[in-house]
């Protein structure tokens, strides 16, 4: 029941006593490598003719399993085991197709690895389930970013800022960051208060100051209200005098340097002179600032305006002194006049209020008008 070809193959490959079925020697391995380089990895019958007792099948298996430099001889990795599990579950013992999924591994190496270690695990525990690999946890972003923003670090509020129509900011800092030039000028060429809140983010500065005063000293509420009104009028005056540029703030004002403000407001403390109204207008040294009354949370445009707009405060102070001077002159004229007349229709200049006066003499305009009538009545002499 056997054909001639079958008998010939059986004799040449198995039964011939001249066949060498023992281990390969170094000389045989070297000949296989040399003839593979000469004939290529396909002509195994021609290569076997140069190896006594070896057939083409033996040379091919020796090359692909051991001598090929592209074959991996390292230990098996978990990723390769996972691929073998999945492929064997789908393909079974089709080692040649499984080996195509593993570059550098031969079908014989895959089969040996399966039979030696992996098959026992599958028989006892079954195929391992594919565990969903979660991505690495994202790094926390709660670190603080250092910034030199107008000489104080900004802590963003815990809640969202009020105002639903406002566009979200592109960065974590709601203040405009002004680049620091190389040369530090001696003066700040632009009002500090206008540089503070360029993006116009609402800052609860007045509320913070008022809350601080209310908690510690309730008697100062009146002073706080007056301070708020003064700040509002000062800010409106500054906005009306000079419009804020919208682009290229650093290029238009090269003399701006944020560290100068830092030195004047935080390092120097109370006795640091600050130039705040341009290169040609200089303000007097800023008065001492009670830092205990200004908490850290009130670091805002309002606070910087208190520190850097001292010239306007000085003007207001001068107006108050001028008003007191007018009152003193009024009192002097009242006491030195010999023609005092208490007629309710033509009242004399007096610092004492009279209940029957038709007009109040508390304003400079009314004082001037009353004083003019008085001079007309008495012939222009006082």
UniProtKB/Swiss-Prot annotation:
Subcellular location: Host nucleus
Chief localization: host cell
Superkingdom, natural source: Viruses
GO molecular function: DNA-binding transcription factor activity, RNA polymerase II-specific; RNA polymerase II cis-regulatory region sequence-specific DNA binding
Gene3D superfamilies: Homeodomain-like
Annotated region (Negative regulatory domain (incomplete)), positions in chain: 257-376
Regions recorded as binding DNA: 44-67, 95-118
Job description of the protein: DNA-binding protein that specifically recognizes the sequence 5'-YAAC[GT]G-3'. The v-Myb oncogene transforms immature myelomonocytic avian cells in culture and induces myeloblastosis (myeloid leukemia) in chickens.
Name of the protein described by the UniProt record: Transforming protein Myb
């Amino acid at each position: 029941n056997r054909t001639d070809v079958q008998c010939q193959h059986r004799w040449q490959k198995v039964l011939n006593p001249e066949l060498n079925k023992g281990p390969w020697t170094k000389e045989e391995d070297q000949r296989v490598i040399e003839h593979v380089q000469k004939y290529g990895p396909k002509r195994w019958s021609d290569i076997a003719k140069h190896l006594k007792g070896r057939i083409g099948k033996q040379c091919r298996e020796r090359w692909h399993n051991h001598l090929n430099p592209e074959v991996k001889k390292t230990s098996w990795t978990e990723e390769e085991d996972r691929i073998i599990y999945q492929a064997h579950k789908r393909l079974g013992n089709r080692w040649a197709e499984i080996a195509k999924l593993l570059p550098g591994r031969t079908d014989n190496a895959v089969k040996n690895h399966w039979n030696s270690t992996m098959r026992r695990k599958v028989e006892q525990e079954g195929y391992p389930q594919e565990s969903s690999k979660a991505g690495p946890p994202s790094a926390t972003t709660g670190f603080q970013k250092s910034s030199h923003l107008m000489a104080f670090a900004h802590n963003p509020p815990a809640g969202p800022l009020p105002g639903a129509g406002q566009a979200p900011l592109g960065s974590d800092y709601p203040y405009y960051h002004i680049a620091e030039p190389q040369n530090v000028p001696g003066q700040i060429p632009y009002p500090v208060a206008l540089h503070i809140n360029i993006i116009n983010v609402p800052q609860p500065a007045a509320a913070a100051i008022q809350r601080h005063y209310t908690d510690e000293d309730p008697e100062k509420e009146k002073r706080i209200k007056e301070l708020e009104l003064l700040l509002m009028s000062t800010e409106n005056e500054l906005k009306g005098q000079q419009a804020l540029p919208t682009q290229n703030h650093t290029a238009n004002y090269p003399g701006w340097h944020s560290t100068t403000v830092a030195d004047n407001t935080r390092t120097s403390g109370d006795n640091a002179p600050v130039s705040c109204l341009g290169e040609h207008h200089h303000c007097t040294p800023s008065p001492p600032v009670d830092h205990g009354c200004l908490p850290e949370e009130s670091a805002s445009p309002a606070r910087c305006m208190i520190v850097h707009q001292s010239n306007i405060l000085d003007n207001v102070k001068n107006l108050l002194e001028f008003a007191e001077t007018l009152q003193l002159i009024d009192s002097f004229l009242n006491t030195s006049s010999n023609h005092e007349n208490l007629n309710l229709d033509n009242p004399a200049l007096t610092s004492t209020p009279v209940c029957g006066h038709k007009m109040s003499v508390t304003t400079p305009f009314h004082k001037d008008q009353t004083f003019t009538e008085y001079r007309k009545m008495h012939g222009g002499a006082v």
